Structures are given as C-alpha cells and as structure tokens.
C-alpha cells in the first residue's frame, strides 16, 4: 500500500490531491488560528488534528496563528495554554508562532486601499443603529447616512480613529458592498472598531482593531496558506473572505473550505456556557476533569493518542452531527487496556479478617503488571491476615448470578488464596464492619487440590500495608445527551458527576507519577491528580470505567 493510500480520505484531502495533481499548488500550507480568549476544548482538537495532520501527511507546513484582534478578551495566559495543548496533542507548528497583530500595519494599509477605491467608509451610526439598518433575512438593509462620504473625508476620519480622536462606539470603518445582499454578512460589514485597551503583543500602539473577517483572509494570504479550513458556521463568511482579497492588491488568494464542527453528547462546547460553568463554580476551573477542555481531559487521564484516534474515527465531513460520548470513552478505554499497568485499590472498603492465617505475619504475592504483556514485568504485593475488600464484593445472601463472596461460600482473592466467609460483625445500625473468613493454605495462585470449582475472583489490599487514597469518581457532567438544547442547561448537570471516596491502595502506588494511567483491577482506569495529589496525600481521578455503564442504564 502506498503512503497516499494509507492516509485517511475525506473531501478536503480529495481537494488537496486534485490541487497537487493539477499543479495548482506544489505544496500544502495550512494553519490553526485560535483566538487567545479561552482554553481549547475537544472541538478545537478536531481542527488541530485536521490542519496539522494534513501538513504532516503531505510534507507541508502548518502555522500556529493567534487571531489576537480583540485585546479586551485576550490574555497571554491563553496564548501559553494553547501552545501547550497543541504540543501535548503531538504537533509542532512550522517556523515561528504567528500573530494577527504581526500584520496590523499591513492591515491598516489595506483598509486605506479600500477607502481609496471607494470600497470602505467611516460610519458614525451606533452599534444598535447599525444592527437596525442591517435588516433581516426577509428584509433588505438600508444605507447609512454616512455611506456616501468622499474618499478624502473617509481617509481623514479613519486617521482620526487611529489617532484616538473618537470615543469607543462613536465610529467604525465599514466595507461598502451591498445593503440589499441576500447574505447579511455582505451588508457593509464592519472592518475596524475602536477599543482603548492594552494589547498583549502590541501594547498601546493601536486603539483601532480589525475585525475577524477582514483580518483572517489577509493573514492567510500574507502567510501563503493554500487551504484555509474552517467550520461550517463560517460558510457564508467565505463570500466576504473572497471579496476582501479580490479588492486589495495582494498576490496570493487562498481558498476557504468548511467542515462540520465536533458536537459531543453530554457536554457543551459554547465558550459562553463553559465560562458560566467556571464562573458560577459548577466546576473547579477550566481544567476540571469533567470539562471538555483539552486541559480537563488531560487531567482526567486521557492520552493524546486516544484523542487523536477519536478524531480520526469520527472523520471529516460537511454534515453536522452529534457524536456519542461512548465513542470518545471507547478510544481511551482501548488505549489504557493495552498500555496501563494494573494495580489494586479498594474504593468502598470493609475489613476482612482471615482467622486461620498466621496472625501478625505477611508474605509477598507476585502479580503481573499486565495480564497479556509479560514484558511489562511484575510486582510484589504484600498479603496478610487482615485485608480490605470492596463492600459490594460481599453479601450475606445472593443468587447464583452473584460471583463474589457470600456467607458460607468460597471466592478467590486475586493472585492469592481461596477464602470462605464464616461470619460477620455489625455495628448498632446493622452495617457490616468486619467479615471473618477462613482460607485454604494450599491454593496460593492455584486451584484447590480436591478439584472443587471456585468461580469468583475479587481484589483486595493488605490492611497493614495499605495506602490511604482519595479516589475521585468523575462521570459525565450532564445527565442528558444534549444539555445545550435545554431551556436552562445548568439544570441538567449530573449531581453525581463527581463522587469523592476514601479508600485504600496497594503500596506499589506510593510512587505513582502525576498523570500516569493505571487500571485499578475490576474498577476502571485512574491517574494521579495533578492538582490535589501531594507527597503525603494520594488523589486518583477516574478516567473511565471498565465498561460503558451509561449504555446499560439506557437500555
């Protein structure tokens, strides 16, 4: 199979293949242009993987360009976060990082060119009046009374805007196109507005800032972008993209292509809604493991490779659709099942005492770090007469489907002995506090000599050697598949999206590394938390369960 045949195909790659075959382009140059006004989420990961992935596959280039045209909402903190997220996902940008603000002088010159051609004018309508004059989908707009100013007057007023001679909101520069256009984006869109705010890159040099639609296409052209890839909501904006480039003196005219954005069940992607979750303290911050942000997914324990695999599986189309959360969870579950070392931790502990085991003694039990990967080695886990097991792994009475410990019956302790429940001790409220058992000393990691069958296996932790751990059971943040469609999306927050448990773990986890994934046997996949874990306190986040419990609940 050739390299081209091995690449995933989609309509964008087909366009690129045709452009290269026809000689329209000899190389491929893409860009990822986020605005540094927030943290990236998994929807951005689709654009990152698409733009950087195409550049990699075609031996081309991909720029990281910050669309930094609104100093009021932007911050250097977001710049650094975005750079980190792109690199964590496994990509590197070509050359130096680009900023739209790098081109402010050229953008101003192109605006002056449009004025000189009679294609832009300074408007003094208020924002509300501009909105009113713009019309609607069913009614044409009407011309501003300032639309027919002379070129000389517009040049003077635009220079006055630049010099700070107008207050914010008192003037703007608009393109002179067609107020009766069926496309509202073409009804004399604003090109420049006034903002007296310090910019994180240019300081106080400017008090006028270009709008996205004016900046985006020119930045693409100046950087030699061959294929400008945007999500579908910018489809109508392509007309303005082309209009600007057609009416200025610039040698390169990139083409814009649109693809569907990523919509994911049980979450929201709107920056406004995500910000509300943070500011109203429904979550602990932008990196809360329940958030769809890349930093949140990373803290929860998602690997970069699992996110890339997810993006690869959903593909690139022009058709808007919503992806099941189970698809994302399946990718990380497959990754960690293959690569995560195993360990034992008891999340809801109850004491179990083996009465015929030598009291005060212990031994080491050898356990594989991965059941199907001997190259991952093994570890020694201490075993003693007193152990912790999970409360759900014992019942005084149970039917035949229950394959765990039952009063008077046997079960195997993982990689250790067969035990039999003999009696229990309860508190005054009837809760079991201790389970008393006997063990078969001849069954260490082997079947009973008399051939009796013991079907159930449960995990355990030696009480004398156990590490106290806080276990944070993260789940889906919302309880409905489409919270964004609800009248009040906050009312659909899942009250059990975070449950905090105090449990015990085997001593090998004492030196767990932040972010490293483990399978807690029979429980799920977990990683050491980067925020709350300390040298003296182990805090583990659940990344994902061993199976999709939501699918079962919905049946």
Curated annotation (Swiss-Prot):
CDD domains: GlnRS_core (cd00807). One of its GO terms (molecular function) is glutamine-tRNA ligase activity. Pfam families: tRNA-synt_1c (PF00749), tRNA-synt_1c_C (PF03950), tRNA-synt_1c_C2 (PF20974). This is Glutamine--tRNA ligase. NCBIfam families: glnS, PRK14703.1. ATP binds at residues 35-37, 41-47, 231, 261-262, 269-271. It is found in: Cytoplasm. The keyword Cell wall biogenesis/degradation does not apply.
């Amino acid at each position: 199979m050739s390299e081209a045949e091995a690449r995933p195909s989609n309509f964008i790659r087909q366009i690129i293949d045709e452009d290269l075959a026809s000689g329209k382009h000899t190389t491929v140059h893409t860009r990822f242009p986020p605005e540094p006004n927030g943290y990236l989420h998994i929807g951005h990961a689709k654009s990152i993987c698409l733009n950087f992935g195409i550049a990699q596959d075609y031996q081309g280039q991909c720029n990281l360009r910050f669309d930094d045209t609104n100093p009021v909402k932007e911050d250097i903190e977001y710049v650094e976060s975005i750079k980190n997220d792109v690199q964590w996902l496994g990509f590197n940008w070509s050359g130096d990082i680009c900023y739209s603000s790098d081109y402010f002088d050229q953008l101003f010159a192109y605006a002056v060119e449009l004025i000189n051609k009679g294609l832009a004018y300074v408007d003094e309508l208020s924002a509300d009046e501009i909105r009113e004059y713009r019309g609607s989908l069913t009614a044409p707009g009407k011309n501003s009374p300032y639309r027919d100013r002379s070129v000389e007057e517009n040049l003077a007023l635009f220079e006055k805007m630049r010099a700070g001679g107008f207050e914010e909101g008192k003037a703007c520069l608009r393109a002179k196109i067609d107020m009766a256009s069926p496309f509202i984006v073409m009804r004399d869109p604003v090109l420049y507005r006034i903002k007296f705010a310090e910019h994180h890159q240019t300081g106080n040099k400017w008090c006028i800032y270009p709008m996205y639609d004016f900046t985006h296409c020119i930045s693409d052209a100046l950087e030699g972008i061959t294929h400008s890839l945007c999500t579908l909501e910018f489809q109508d904006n392509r007309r303005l993209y082309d209009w600007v480039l057609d009416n200025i003196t610039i040698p390169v005219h990139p083409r814009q292509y649109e693809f569907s954005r990523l919509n994911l069940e049980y979450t929201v992607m709107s920056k406004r809604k995500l910000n509300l979750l943070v500011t109203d303290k429904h979550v602990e911050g932008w990196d809360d493991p329940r958030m769809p942000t890349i930093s949140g997914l990373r803290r929860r324990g998602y690997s970069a490779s699992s996110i890339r695999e997810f993006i690869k599986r959903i593909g690139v189309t022009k058709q808007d659709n919503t992806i099941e959360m189970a698809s994302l969870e399946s990718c990380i579950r497959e990754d960690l099942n293959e690569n995560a070392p195993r360990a034992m931790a008891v999340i809801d502990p109850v004491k179990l005492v083996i009465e015929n085991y030598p009291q005060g003694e212990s031994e080491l039990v050898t356990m594989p770090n991965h059941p199907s990967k001997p190259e991952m080695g093994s570890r020694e886990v201490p075993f003693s007469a007193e152990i912790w097991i999970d409360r759900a792994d014992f019942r005084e009475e149970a039917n035949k489907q229950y394959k765990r410990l039952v009063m008077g019956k046997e079960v195997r302790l993982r990689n250790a002995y067969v035990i039999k429940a003999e009696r229990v001790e309860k508190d005054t409220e009837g809760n079991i506090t201790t389970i008393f058992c006997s063990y078969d000393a001849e069954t260490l990691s082997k079947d009973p000599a008399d051939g009796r069958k013991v079907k159930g296996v449960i995990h355990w932790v030696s009480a004398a050697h156990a590490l106290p751990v806080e276990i944070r059971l993260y789940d889906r943040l919302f309880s409905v598949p489409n919270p964004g469609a609800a009248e009040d999306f906050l009312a659909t927050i899942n009250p059990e999206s975070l449950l905090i448990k105090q449990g015990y773990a085997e001593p090998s986890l004492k030196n767990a590394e932040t972010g490293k994934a483990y399978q807690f046997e029979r429980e799920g996949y977990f990683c050491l938390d980067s925020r709350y874990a300390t040298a003296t306190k182990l805090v583990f986040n659940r990344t994902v369960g061993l199976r999709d419990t939501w699918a079962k609940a919905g049946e």
